[in-house]
Regions:
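Noncatalytic nucleic-acid binding interfaces
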Residues: 447
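A short, conserved beta-strand element in the Rossmann-like catalytic core
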Residues: 118-119, 427
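Short beta-strand segments
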Residues: 7-9, 56, 111-114, 143-147, ...
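Conserved core of the sugar-phosphate nucleotidyltransferase
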Residues: 121-242, 262
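Conserved N-terminal catalytic core of the sugar/cofactor nucleotidyltransferase
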Residues: 2-7, 14-22, 30-114, 120-124, ...
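Left-handed beta-helix
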Residues: 2, 204-404, 409-428, 435, ...
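Residue-level signal for inorganic ion chemistry
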Residues: 28, 38, 95, 116, ...
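A residue-level structural signature of the nucleotidyltransferase/glycosyltransferase Rossmann-like core
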Residues: 110, 191, 198-199, 271, ...
């Protein structure tokens, strides 16, 4: 029997700031190796017989998801966009309704996974999923409980009930994150598992329970999926209908109340990577228990996590620190209190700082750009345009633009003229001039853009055409 993976890639995780940002949360980060957490989540399904995954994400993350799926050859009209976040119960309902509408298998088994978890033992993971298959196929709602390795206060727990099969238990209760003494009691009892947030069930089984236990969520999601607007690789649901949907987790809405919940124990080196200290826990370390990533020199240091994006970092005689450098921010924290990084993010939000929101590298449907420098009346960006992509025709009243081609060839439209600009050549776009840029080549086009003028705001972009095949929201995101 095959599975339909449902990957939940929503959320705006702030716990790994400054690497994670609101527009680039942790599920899109590469914490180990070259692949992101999202990509690794999909890759670990290779040993299971699965259909192409369905990914559910926030609308603002759609370009990131599409690009990361394309990189691993998994982009196939399979991204459901949530216009607003409504937690996991509605998100899974959207996937279940879509699965029943579109699947060749009339009632597929949904393997629901978070995009931002790490699983180190993929063989054990696969074995647990296979073990859960028979229960899910027969109408049970299976959740995977992580066998705890220590007393942990950072996770919710699942208490197992009666044994219903070989290493499969009825769910007795879900419990909130405990204090350290209670967590110790849970660990000693052997009857409690960490709540992984991973599930396996038939699409119809989940929807039937949701309809019975949370009818408002069921009805709102049913209506939202009833007005789907396909948009290339994206599935856009009805925004107004989904806005009326209550926000609730699958645990609260369904799993805590259903009579059909089953927990399957799993020991697979699982982590939700909920903090820098937990990332240090699962990372490969040197002989002094340091995790060093980037251009780093460490002398007489131990138990540190040090990450450099583009600077040389030297450390002498320090221990138990998290040091993370990006192009626009530096974090220095004690590993024992690094969870307070959320206070930094709150500070940045209160002061309307860009550092909580996005990196200097920003992805767009046509490619990406990096902000190199900015100041009064100027902005400098390095722009990469993918082969065959373009900026739609537009103009600006208050700024001029200089384009300098570094590699590739640009087809430029300026007013009534259309001409080619090659490597080491440049062109100038005056204010109040209709212009467009296209990469007609087979390789990426890379250029430097210098904006100059009295006003550089986003509302001084007047677009004169809609990008073919894309919604208006896409054309509103050149900058």
């Amino acid at each position: 029997m095959s599975f339909l993976p449902v990957i939940m890639a929503g959320g705006t995780g702030s716990r790994l700031w400054p690497l994670s940002r609101e527009y680039h949360p942790k599920q899109f980060l590469s914490v180990e190796g070259k692949l992101s957490m999202l990509q690794n989540t999909i890759k670990r399904l290779a040993s299971l017989s699965t259909e192409e995954p369905v990914v559910i994400c926030n609308d603002r993350h759609r370009f990131l998801v599409a690009e990361q799926l394309r990189e691993i050859d998994k982009l196939a009209n399979n991204i459901i966009l949530e216009p607003v976040g409504r937690n996991t119960a509605p998100a899974i309902a959207l996937a279940a309704f879509c699965a029943l509408q579109n699947a060749d298998n009339a009632d597929p088994l949904l393997l629901v996974l978070a995009a931002d978890h790490v699983i180190q033992d993929e063989i054990a993971f696969t074995k647990a999923v296979r073990h859960a298959e028979e229960y899910a196929a027969n109408g049970k709602l299976v959740t995977f409980g992580i066998v705890p390795t220590h007393a942990e206060t950072g996770y919710g727990y699942i208490r197992r009930g009666e044994l219903i099969g070989n290493d499969a238990y009825a769910v007795a209760e879900f419990v909130e994150k405990p204090d350290i003494d209670t967590a110790g009691d849970y660990f000693k009892s052997g009857k409690y598992y960490w709540n992984s947030g991973m599930f396996l069930f038939r699409a119809s089984s989940y929807l039937n329970e949701l309809k019975y236990l949370s009818p408002e969520i069921y009805k709102a999601c049913e209506k939202a999926v009833g007005h789907i607007n396909p948009d290339l690789d994206f599935i856009r649901i009805d925004k107004e209908e989904f806005m009326s949907c209550p926000s609730d987790s699958i645990d609260y809405a369904v799993m805590e109340h259903t009579q059909h919940a089953v927990v399957i124990p799993m020991s697979a080196g699982w982590s939700d990577v909920g903090s820098w200290s937990s990332l240090w826990d699962i990372s490969n370390k040197d002989y002094q228990r340091n995790v060093l990533k980037g251009d780093i020199f460490a002398h007489a240091c131990n138990d540190n996590y040090i990450y450099s994006e583009d600077m040389f970092i030297s450390a002498i005689g320090v221990s138990n620190l998290v040091i993370v450098q990006t192009t626009d921010a530096l974090l220095v924290a004690n590993k024992d209190t690094v969870q307070d990084v959320k206070k930094i993010v709150d500070y940045l939000k209160r002061n309307d700082r860009n550092e909580y929101k996005q990196h200097q590298e920003v992805f767009r449907p046509w490619g990406k750009y990096n902000v190199i420098d900015s100041g009064k009346n100027y902005l400098v960006r390095c722009i990469t345009v993918k082969p065959g992509e373009k900026f739609v025709a537009q103009m600006h009243h208050h700024r001029a633009e200089h384009w300098i081609v570094l590699s590739g060839t640009a087809r430029v439209t300026k007013g009534e003229q259309t001409y080619m600009v090659s490597e080491n050549e440049s062109t100038f776009i005056p204010p109040n001039t209709i212009h467009a840029l296209e990469n007609p080549g087979m390789t990426p086009l890379k250029l430097i853009e210098i904006q100059s003028g009295t006003y550089l705001g986003e509302d001084d972009i007047i677009r004169l055409e809609q990008r073919s095949g894309f919604s208006k929201e896409w054309t509103n995101e050149r900058s």
